[in-house]
Amino acid sequence: MRVLFFLFCLLNFVFANEITTPIKEIEASANVLGTTLINGKLFIATDGGTVEIYDPKESKFDEIIKMDDIKTYVSDHERPKILNVDELNGKMLILSEGDYATKVLYIRENGQMRSIKMANQATKKALFLDDERVALASISNEIYFLNLKSGEIYDSFKISIAMLSDMEISEDRGTLAIACESGKVYFYNILAKKMDRILDIHTDNIYDIAYKNGVMISGGTDRIAGIFSAGTLKKINTGFLVYGVGLSSDGKIAAYMSDEMSDVNLVDSVTLDKITMLKTGQSTINSIVFISDNEVVTSAYEKKILFWRVR
């Protein structure tokens, strides 16, 4: 009897660290390519040519922006994939597919949309530096700086011969964190035009990074989640490819996809102590976003987006 009681208590302890049911589920109009939280709103990029803005506090969609159809070599009416979205001071940036496998940068302000042609069609990500400047990252690991008024590139540099994986920017828009196929993460000081730090984290390609409050987490092919916090780099061996990662706004809680079931582990970014596991049941996770320290959003290449209460 004592043995059975002990096993019951042990199982309760184990499963208490797992969350199996989300508090809320919403559905985008098309498969989700990524999500990002900006000023408390969830910006959802889809492969159906839409940017869908959801207000978590009000539990409703504020707006759905639908891009025009594009032409391909097989059809004159295809929906463009939205590659990424950013927003600053009421101005929105949308990096989208264009006609015949091109890329188009759209700037939306006061309800008006304008497009900017880009010479480099290998652009993978775009982020605001300020109201008039944008950083563009190409898959060939070149970073370009674009003046929105003139539409001209005013500066650029190449990081390495390795392909670019991902790019994020600090809250003050002063530092770019750039992840590469080589497994390294570069921290570029925009004002000083120099690398402040280079971290050699992974032995192979990096899938995803998050960068909040000076803390960085990366996930890669080598089944490692790397966390740089308080000047120290720590590594977690997950045993599976780490496709998606995320951080709370203060950087104190780190999250990463941990296995083939798309479970998401949440840990203390300094001690690496486990906080909980989210049993998402989704396909491969492509973004993990913290609404707050207590609420996390997970998405995958599907319409379903899940909200989780973690504390």
Predicted features along the sequence, with ranges:
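Short loop/turn segments that connect beta-strands within beta-propeller blades
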Residues: 56-59, 107-111, 147-151, 189-193, ...
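WD40 beta-propeller blade core
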Residues: 52, 103-106, 144, 186, ...
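Hydrophobic beta-strand positions that form the internal "hydrophobic ladder"
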Residues: 42, 92-93, 134-135, 176, ...
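A short beta-strand motif characteristic of beta-propeller blades
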Residues: 21-27, 60-75, 111-117, 152-158, ...
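Residue-level detector of Asp-centered blade-edge/turn motifs that repeat once per structural unit
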Residues: 37-39, 87-89, 129-131, 171-172, ...
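Conserved strand-to-loop turn within each blade of WD40 beta-propeller repeats
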Residues: 46-47, 97-99, 137-140, 179-182, ...
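Beta-strand-rich domains and repeat architectures in extracellular enzymes and scaffolds
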Residues: 24-49
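Hydrophobic core register within WD40 beta-propeller blades
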Residues: 35, 83-85, 125-126, 167, ...
